[in-house]
Protein backbone atom coordinates (compact mmCIF):
# COMPACT_ATOMS: atom_id res chain seq x y z
CA UNK A 1 0.00 0.00 0.00
CA UNK A 2 2.85 2.44 0.78
CA UNK A 3 4.19 1.94 -2.75
CA UNK A 4 0.86 2.98 -4.25
CA UNK A 5 0.68 6.45 -2.64
CA UNK A 6 3.65 7.96 -4.49
CA UNK A 7 2.27 6.53 -7.74
CA UNK A 8 -1.17 8.06 -7.06
CA UNK A 9 0.43 11.40 -6.18
CA UNK A 10 2.43 11.33 -9.41
CA UNK A 11 -0.66 10.69 -11.56
CA UNK A 12 -2.64 13.36 -9.70
CA UNK A 13 0.07 15.99 -10.29
CA UNK A 14 0.69 14.89 -13.88
CA UNK A 15 -2.97 15.50 -14.78
CA UNK A 16 -3.07 19.12 -13.61
CA UNK A 17 -3.32 21.53 -16.57
CA UNK A 18 -2.27 25.15 -16.39
CA UNK A 19 -3.97 27.73 -18.60
CA UNK A 20 -1.95 30.38 -20.37
CA UNK A 21 -3.25 33.29 -18.29
CA UNK A 22 0.05 34.32 -16.76
CA UNK A 23 -0.43 37.97 -15.71
CA UNK A 24 3.25 38.65 -16.39
CA UNK A 25 3.17 37.68 -20.07
CA UNK A 26 4.18 40.61 -22.26
CA UNK A 27 1.45 42.28 -24.27
CA UNK A 28 1.92 42.64 -28.02
CA UNK A 29 1.68 46.42 -28.41
CA UNK A 30 3.13 46.97 -31.88
CA UNK A 31 1.25 46.12 -35.06
CA UNK A 32 2.55 45.46 -38.55
CA UNK A 33 1.48 48.95 -39.65
CA UNK A 34 3.41 50.64 -36.78
CA UNK A 35 6.72 50.57 -38.64
CA UNK A 36 8.61 48.62 -41.25
CA UNK A 37 9.80 45.25 -39.97
CA UNK A 38 13.46 45.97 -40.78
CA UNK A 39 15.19 49.33 -40.34
CA UNK A 40 18.80 50.45 -40.80
CA UNK A 41 20.46 53.61 -39.61
CA UNK A 42 23.25 55.39 -37.78
CA UNK A 43 23.82 56.68 -34.29
CA UNK A 44 26.15 57.09 -31.38
CA UNK A 45 26.31 55.33 -28.04
CA UNK A 46 28.70 56.93 -25.55
CA UNK A 47 31.83 57.17 -27.73
CA UNK A 48 30.77 54.46 -30.19
CA UNK A 49 29.82 55.73 -33.66
CA UNK A 50 27.80 52.97 -35.27
CA UNK A 51 25.56 51.62 -37.96
CA UNK A 52 22.52 49.84 -36.60
CA UNK A 53 19.89 47.38 -37.74
CA UNK A 54 16.53 47.18 -35.98
CA UNK A 55 13.84 44.50 -36.11
CA UNK A 56 10.35 45.68 -35.13
CA UNK A 57 8.13 42.86 -33.88
CA UNK A 58 4.81 42.85 -31.94
CA UNK A 59 6.64 42.75 -28.59
CA UNK A 60 9.21 45.48 -29.14
CA UNK A 61 12.34 46.42 -31.02
CA UNK A 62 15.46 44.24 -31.21
CA UNK A 63 18.63 45.94 -32.42
CA UNK A 64 22.26 45.37 -33.26
CA UNK A 65 24.88 48.14 -33.45
CA UNK A 66 28.36 47.86 -34.95
CA UNK A 67 30.91 50.63 -35.28
CA UNK A 68 34.10 52.19 -33.97
CA UNK A 69 35.02 54.09 -30.84
CA UNK A 70 36.22 57.59 -31.67
CA UNK A 71 39.51 57.54 -29.81
CA UNK A 72 43.08 57.47 -31.10
CA UNK A 73 42.89 53.82 -32.13
CA UNK A 74 39.33 53.60 -33.60
CA UNK A 75 38.87 50.07 -32.29
CA UNK A 76 35.70 48.19 -33.16
CA UNK A 77 32.70 47.78 -30.89
CA UNK A 78 29.22 46.25 -31.07
CA UNK A 79 26.08 45.97 -28.97
CA UNK A 80 22.81 44.05 -29.12
CA UNK A 81 19.63 44.79 -27.23
CA UNK A 82 15.87 44.70 -26.99
CA UNK A 83 13.32 47.37 -26.03
CA UNK A 84 9.75 46.69 -24.92
CA UNK A 85 7.09 49.44 -25.32
CA UNK A 86 6.20 50.28 -21.73
CA UNK A 87 4.06 53.42 -22.15
CA UNK A 88 2.90 54.73 -25.53
CA UNK A 89 2.02 58.42 -25.83
CA UNK A 90 0.58 59.05 -29.30
CA UNK A 91 -1.28 57.70 -32.31
CA UNK A 92 2.02 56.54 -33.72
CA UNK A 93 3.76 54.11 -31.39
CA UNK A 94 5.82 56.91 -29.82
CA UNK A 95 6.56 56.46 -26.15
CA UNK A 96 8.74 55.10 -23.41
CA UNK A 97 10.42 51.77 -23.97
CA UNK A 98 12.37 49.76 -21.38
CA UNK A 99 15.17 47.53 -22.54
CA UNK A 100 18.32 45.56 -21.98
CA UNK A 101 21.64 45.71 -23.83
CA UNK A 102 24.95 43.86 -23.92
CA UNK A 103 28.22 44.39 -25.75
CA UNK A 104 31.09 46.87 -25.87
CA UNK A 105 30.35 49.83 -23.61
CA UNK A 106 33.57 51.83 -23.73
CA UNK A 107 37.18 51.85 -24.86
CA UNK A 108 40.05 52.02 -22.34
CA UNK A 109 43.76 52.69 -22.83
CA UNK A 110 45.61 49.61 -21.51
CA UNK A 111 49.20 48.53 -22.19
CA UNK A 112 49.77 51.31 -24.77
CA UNK A 113 46.69 50.42 -26.83
CA UNK A 114 42.93 50.82 -26.62
CA UNK A 115 40.77 47.85 -25.68
CA UNK A 116 36.99 47.62 -25.89
CA UNK A 117 35.29 46.84 -22.58
CA UNK A 118 32.37 44.38 -22.48
CA UNK A 119 29.32 45.07 -20.33
CA UNK A 120 25.56 44.89 -20.02
CA UNK A 121 22.73 46.93 -18.57
CA UNK A 122 19.19 48.23 -18.72
CA UNK A 123 17.88 51.39 -20.36
CA UNK A 124 14.90 53.68 -20.67
CA UNK A 125 14.33 55.11 -24.14
CA UNK A 126 11.94 57.55 -25.72
CA UNK A 127 11.22 56.21 -29.20
CA UNK A 128 9.64 58.19 -32.04
CA UNK A 129 8.22 55.44 -34.23
CA UNK A 130 6.52 55.90 -37.57
CA UNK A 131 6.10 53.88 -40.75
CA UNK A 132 9.13 55.59 -42.32
CA UNK A 133 11.64 55.94 -39.47
CA UNK A 134 12.63 55.12 -35.90
CA UNK A 135 14.37 57.71 -33.76
CA UNK A 136 15.39 56.81 -30.22
CA UNK A 137 16.98 58.66 -27.31
CA UNK A 138 18.03 56.45 -24.41
CA UNK A 139 19.75 56.55 -21.06
CA UNK A 140 20.93 53.34 -19.50
CA UNK A 141 22.74 52.08 -16.48
CA UNK A 142 25.04 49.11 -16.68
CA UNK A 143 28.36 47.70 -15.64
CA UNK A 144 31.43 46.59 -17.52
CA UNK A 145 34.02 43.94 -16.98
CA UNK A 146 36.98 44.58 -14.67
CA UNK A 147 40.06 45.45 -16.72
CA UNK A 148 43.68 45.13 -15.61
CA UNK A 149 46.97 45.93 -17.31
CA UNK A 150 49.96 43.61 -17.80
CA UNK A 151 51.16 44.32 -14.24
CA UNK A 152 47.83 43.40 -12.65
CA UNK A 153 46.96 47.03 -11.93
CA UNK A 154 43.23 47.67 -12.13
CA UNK A 155 42.37 50.10 -14.94
CA UNK A 156 38.57 49.82 -14.73
CA UNK A 157 36.47 48.42 -11.88
CA UNK A 158 33.11 46.73 -12.27
CA UNK A 159 30.86 49.56 -11.12
CA UNK A 160 27.65 51.19 -12.37
CA UNK A 161 27.99 53.59 -15.27
CA UNK A 162 25.57 55.64 -17.35
CA UNK A 163 25.18 55.16 -21.08
CA UNK A 164 23.59 57.71 -23.43
CA UNK A 165 22.50 56.83 -26.94
CA UNK A 166 20.79 58.29 -30.00
CA UNK A 167 19.89 56.40 -33.18
CA UNK A 168 18.03 57.29 -36.35
CA UNK A 169 16.85 54.49 -38.64
CA UNK A 170 14.77 54.26 -41.79
CA UNK A 171 12.68 51.34 -43.01
CA UNK A 172 13.88 49.07 -45.78
For the regions a protein language model found, what residue spans apply to each?
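Outer-membrane beta-barrel proteins
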Residues: 57-59, 83-91, 125-130, 168-172
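Outer-membrane beta-barrel domain signature
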Residues: 27-29, 38-42, 69-71, 109-115, ...
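Outer-membrane beta-barrel "beta-signal"
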Residues: 23, 80-82, 157-172
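Transmembrane beta-strand segments that form the barrel wall of outer-membrane beta-barrel proteins
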Residues: 30-46, 51-53, 57-72, 96-107
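Cleavable N-terminal export/targeting peptides
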Residues: 1-33, 172
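Short loop/turn motifs that connect adjacent beta-strands in outer-membrane beta-barrel proteins
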Residues: 21-22, 27-35, 87-96, 129-136
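Sequence/structural signature of outer-membrane beta-barrel proteins
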Residues: 49, 60, 67-73, 87-89, ...
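Residues that define the transmembrane beta-barrel architecture of outer-membrane proteins
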Residues: 34-38, 45-49, 72-78, 94, ...
Amino acid sequence: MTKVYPLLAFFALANIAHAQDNPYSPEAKLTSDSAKTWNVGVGFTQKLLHLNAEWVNPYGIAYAKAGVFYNDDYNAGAQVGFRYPYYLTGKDKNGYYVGVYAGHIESKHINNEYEARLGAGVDLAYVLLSKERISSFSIGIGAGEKMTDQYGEVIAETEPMLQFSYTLSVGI
